[in-house]
Amino acid sequence: MAAREGVDNRRTDTRERALAVALELFATHGYTVTSLREIAEHLGVTKAALYFHFRTKEEILTAILRGYLDGIAALAVDATARQPLTAAMREELVRRFAEHQAHWGIDLILLVRQNYTEIQSLPIGEEVREVMASLVAALAPAGSGPAERLRVRTALSAFQIAAVTAARDNDGDGDALQEAALAIALEILAG
């Protein structure tokens, strides 16, 4: 039994490492130009070993985005279940969103920004739109109009802007920028 568990752990580890390597390569080189062979080489496995876990780049991209979206969807479900949200509840949810963004890091943000067209053309693209829209709807007060939904979207985008600024402009401490993004997001939501 222990030998079987060791094999399963290696498979899981290889899969998780493949997702991490692919995320970095997709973010830095682009989804379109990154090949399965390149992912396998960076991972230190054969293309056949990678193929055991993922048959296509689309499967890899979908797995990466689904992992990210699961956390966002959980926030949206939590926010919806707690309606109507108090200011303190909204603040807590935005703080959790900030933690989720920090967990995924700059590579996820760059992946989405730099490969937006490709992502939107895949089935996961619709899921990205739906999950983000559900979070915006849950964080916007009941009966709010377009202006309040835009306020929520703007608040959530502060974390992406901070991460990109830190990565591209080498503008100070990334943690300080994320803290500033949180403060700005909360100010925006407070109106």
Where are these regions (language model features)?
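Hydrophobic/aromatic-rich alpha-helical bundle segments in the mid-to-C-terminal region
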Residues: I109, S121-L189
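Hydrophobic/aromatic residues within well-ordered alpha-helical segments
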Residues: I64, Y68, I72, W104, ...
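Hydrophobic alpha-helical connector segments
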Residues: A63, A74-D107
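Solvent-exposed, amphipathic alpha-helical segments
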Residues: V21, L25-T28, G71-R82, A158-T165
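Short linear capping/connector segments at secondary-structure termini
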Residues: L111-E118
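N-terminal intrinsically disordered/low-complexity leader segments
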Residues: M1-D13
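Helix-turn-helix
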Residues: R17, V21, L25-E59, A63
